[in-house]
Each structure stands twice: as structure tokens, then as C-alpha cells.
Amino acid sequence: MKMFNFLTKTTLCLVVSTALLTMSADAQKTQKLTDPEIASVAVTANQIDIDYAAIAQKKSKNAEVLKFAATMAKDHQAVIDQAVALVTKLKVTPKTNATTKSFLAGATKTKAMLNAKSGKAFDKAYVDNEVAYHKAAINEVETVLIPQSSNSELKSLLQSAVPLFKAHLAHAQMVQKNLK
């Protein structure tokens, strides 16, 4: 019974994370994002992962999970810093939109779920979420944000982030495998 509850909760975590980004991708197929909206999506998605990492840094006792969370916080902050520098240079203000609102709503649920867990169950839920989140984020960047961006510098920033996100996914999958 404990294994069933554990698997059910882990599955819920993955569903919430994947649904968050899938819903936004589906919504954006019918509505083109502007560059200020794309900047908002990029900053929001990166900040959400920093928030997840902060939870992991407070709750986890696993050295590998803690190291991964520190990497997520550092790398995603660097992407935000690059995005902020670019929008400042371009004199563009990121614009909140349906996608950013959807991300934030999903993140609220995921953070509550993560905060409700502890020990090995937390570590597994956090890392499983990171795998799902990075898969969905890579898809969102490649299929929505890059194709819809008009500004070449914004497009270039997004393209340069994809290899980093793919490295994060590989790292998360490695940690996930080691937790089993």
C-alpha cells in the first residue's frame, strides 16, 4: 500500500509539471506570443526552477540532490541575468501573459506537493519533477518560444539556452537513476 501511495504521488507530480507546460504550449499554438511575452515566459520558467531548487536545498539531505539543486539555482539565475540584460538593452518590459500565469499556477501546486514531502520521498519527487519540467521546458523553447520570437537577439538567447536545459535533463535523469 505504501508503494502504491508513493507511486501515485510521484505520478501526480509528473502530471502537474508536464500539464503546466503542455497547457501553455497548446494555448500558444492558437495565439502568437510577442517578444515581451516570450521574455516573461523565459524569466518565469527559470525562476520557477530556482524556487524548486530552493525547496530542495532546504529539505533534502542527499548530497547528490543538493548538488543538483545548487546547479539548477546557479544556472537558471544566469539565464535570467542574461534575459534581463537583453530586455534592458532592448528597452523592452517583459509582459505577463496567459502562459506565465499558467506556469505560476502550476508551480504553486508543485511547490505545495514538494513541501508536503520529506526524506527519500521528497528527493524522488523533486528529481522526477525536474526530469518532467526540463523535458517540457525544452519542448516549449524549441517549438513555441524560438519559432515565435521576432528579435534575433532574443531568439539567439533562447537557442543558446537549449543545450544547457538538455544538460540539466541528462543530469536530472542520472540523479533519478541513482535514487532508485
Predicted regions and their residues:
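His/Met- and acidic-residue-enriched segments that coordinate or traffic transition-metal cofactors
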Residues: K2-L14, A19-K180
